[in-house]
């Protein structure tokens, strides 16, 4: 939990700038979410497709048998560290980011992860096109071989890892 704030502290002088435009704020959050989720898709897919990484690292997350919001925290430390690279890549690509954008990014990601691991049928995300809803993620936890995206299910469609089961 301390890794993300420490990372922000390290790069704060490089990327954090004062807030001055709502439009830029919206563009920043959209770009960060897309880049982070693209990274997450490929990292998550690698964790499943590489037998060593799955058996030694990612299987820990899939050992949680009953959906519970805190299950998203149930991961190997290396998976946590590598998972944090996505937003930092986005921050560095953008070059300048508002602190408010980073705060909203964290709120969205944490609430989304709590939601998709809640085991509750449907969610607020079903109203957003291409959003990864609870049922979608539940299929991933049930079958393990598809549905690697998190926020945006279109990655699975684009890269042909979507399945109706």
Model-identified regions with their sequence ranges:
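Specific transmembrane helices
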Residues: 1-17, 25-37
């Amino acid at each position: 939990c301390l890794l993300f704030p420490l990372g922000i502290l390290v790069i704060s002088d490089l990327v954090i700038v004062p807030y001055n435009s709502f439009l830029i704020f919206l563009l920043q959050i959209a770009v960060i979410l897309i880049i982070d989720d693209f990274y997450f898709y490929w990292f998550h897919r690698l964790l499943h497709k590489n037998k060593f990484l799955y058996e030694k690292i990612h299987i820990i997350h899939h050992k949680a048998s009953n959906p519970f919001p805190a299950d998203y925290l149930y991961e190997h430390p290396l998976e946590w560290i590598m998972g944090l690279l996505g937003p930092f890549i986005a921050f560095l690509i953008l070059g300048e980011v508002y602190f408010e954008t980073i705060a909203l990014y964290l709120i969205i990601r944490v609430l989304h992860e709590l939601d998709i691991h809640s085991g509750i049928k449907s969610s607020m995300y079903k109203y957003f096109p291409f959003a990864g809803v609870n049922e979608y993620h539940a299929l991933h936890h049930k079958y393990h071989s598809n549905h690697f995206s998190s926020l945006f299910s279109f990655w699975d469609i684009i890269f042909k890892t979507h399945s109706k089961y």
